[in-house]
Each structure stands twice: as structure tokens, then as C-alpha cells.
Amino acid sequence: MCAPSCFDWWRALGRAASRRDFVKGALALPLVAAGCATTASPANQAAGRAVLDDAWSVDVHTHPALFQTYSRTTIDEHARAVQAGKLGGAFLAAVGDGPALSIRPNGAPYAAREPAPGVMFGSSWRQLDVLDGHARTLGMRRMLRGGDLAAAIAAHERVAIMAVEGGDFLEGRLENVQRVYDRGVRSIQLVHYRVNELGDIQTEPPVHNGLTPFGRDVVREMNRLGMLVDLAHAPYPVVKGAMDASSRPMLVSHTNIDDYSGYARFVSREHARLVASTGGVLGAWPISIRPASASTFIDHIKRMVDTVGVDHVAIGTDMAGVNPRVVLFTDWTEWPSIPAALLDRGFGREDVAKIMGGNMRRLLEATVS
């Protein structure tokens, strides 16, 4: 979900506008917010920070180019938050379908227009220009090869994994996968809020009834190049098609197990287990769709661990990709609250380290080359 300002910004980038073309204001979404200040014991608060001192951690889905739109804070302030929160790395995502999107009265994003050829690719390219600058400000080294991660961790450097959310920017051209790979992108989320040339989405009725032939070609090309396929926003038939096409494990960067809400962006246990069955990872998502707290988010993580096992769970905050009034995090100073709350809930230190980054390190080193 997104405030109108972010769509205006994406469309402006599609017109080669300045990165300062932010439109002020945010939509009052009909969802409930909550802060993520931990209620963990003082001992576990200290122990949670110690986990982050000793083990690499990563946020698997963020949009730092939108920080100023929502939080009214600068990227320099977020750089200080990264340091204070002991974050080891982050996926920095452009939005591939941004120029097509608008907001329904209920706050739901949808594809409202069909951009002219080249607009979505151009917008994504310019967003990546912005994200490159943000990575430098955040003190992050781009991961381009599998060995880059181990080298950065050994050197106590933070890592940026450049990503695009929504394969719409490919505009049906397989050669664009190679172009963005050469540009430094190492993860593509196949679909977002527009039913595109690759497949259907969770939030609209099916059109293709799964992954398209072009979608299968994109998955295979990403495997060949050494890119991580992200299946967030993809319904079960698309995930099944991607699994059949892929020779490597994949990621669902931000979702939760749907046991009670009926929220379209959550997934069934069968869906989650399919992703995990090939070694994949699912990012637990701290979104508040009802009165929620840090404890509710830990419930989501525990439900996911119970479903797929602790080796297949990570954290994807969607930081600044949704209005901060509907997620449980506003900046990375709150990152240590997650391991603290997990420890307080009875998770062991080794398992907490896996969830915070160890599982994603394994997945990245198995897929990125």
C-alpha cells in the first residue's frame, strides 16, 4: 500500500523528473497502526542487541527512496538509524509498475493506466539511480557476486542488494533482465499491483491462470545470470509455475501466514511450504491490518516458523513502501526490538540469528552470482 505521493513520484521519474519531485501528503488508510517498541525484558533487550553484534542481519524488503515522502526524515537521518539499529544489510527496491498505479477509495493500490512503452523501464532505471546514492549514504556496499557478502561481513561493511518490485518494467522484453543485471540489480519480484506479462497477482482476479511463458523465461534467465527471484504478491498458481521453471530456491520477501484475516496479501500454509520445499525463504511482514503490536508481529513470525521451519524465515519490513501508519516500524532504530521480542518469546539465540539474517545469507549465496 502506498500514499498518493509515491505514485506521483514514480510517474515523475518516468518523465525523467528530478528526484526531489515528491508530492506532500499521505492517504488516511482504513488500517490500524502500532509502534514496535519492544516489551521484552531488559535482559532480552540487551541480548537482542548482542545477537545483532555477533550475527549478520538483513531487511529483505525496503524502499528507502520513499523515506522522505512518509517519515519527513532525510536519508542521512536513516543512515544514523541503520547504525544505531545494527542493521547489516537491506534489499533496496525500486518499483517496476509505479507509473501505472493509483489508489482506490479504500486505500488499495491498483493499475489505473497503461503507461507508454519505455515509461516503466525508464522510471525503474531512475529509481535505481536514486537508490545507488542512498546505498552510499547508508554506508552499504552493493552485493554483485555471491562472494561479496562474505567479504563485506568479514570487513564489517553493510550490504545493499538492489532489487525491483514488479517485473512490469521489463515490458515483455527478456533482454531487459540482462540490462538491469548489468546495472547491479540482483533480485526481481515478478509481480506487484498490475497483472503484467509475467503472471497474475494476489489482489486482482486471475487473467493468465498462473505464470505466463514469458514469466517462465524470466525465471530461467534470472537463474542463468545469478539473480534471486522474489515471489511476493504472486498467487499460488504463479508460485507453482515459478517453482517448476526454476533450478534455484526463491524468496517471498514480505507476507504472513493467513490463518484468520482473509487478507489477500497473506499466503496459505500450503503456499508457504511450497516456497520452503526447495530451500526458499519467506520474509515475515510487520503490517498491521487490525489493532496490533510488536507481540502480534512475533505471533506472525512464530506461525511462519511453525509452518515452514526456522530455517526458512526472514524479516521484510517494507520500510517506507507502505504508509508508516500501517506498519510496525518507522525506522531501523527499532530493528533490535525484533530479536529481543523473539528471545522473550522463547526462541533460542541461534534461531533468532537465523531469522534476522542467517537464512537469507544462505539463500543469497546459493542464488546470486
Provide a role label for each language-model segment.
Residues A294-S295, E350-L364:
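C-terminal helical cap
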Residues A26-P30:
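Sec-dependent signal peptide hydrophobic core
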Residues D311, A366-S369:
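Acidic, glycine-enriched loop/beta-strand segments at the rims
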Residues W285-P286, V308-D331:
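Short acidic/histidine-rich active-site segments
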Residues G14-V23, P42-Q45:
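Twin-arginine (Tat) signal peptide motif
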Residues W9, A40-W285, I289-P291, K302-V305, ...:
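Extended, charged catalytic domains and RNA/DNA-binding interfaces, predominantly
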Residues M1-S18, L31:
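N-terminal secretory signal peptides
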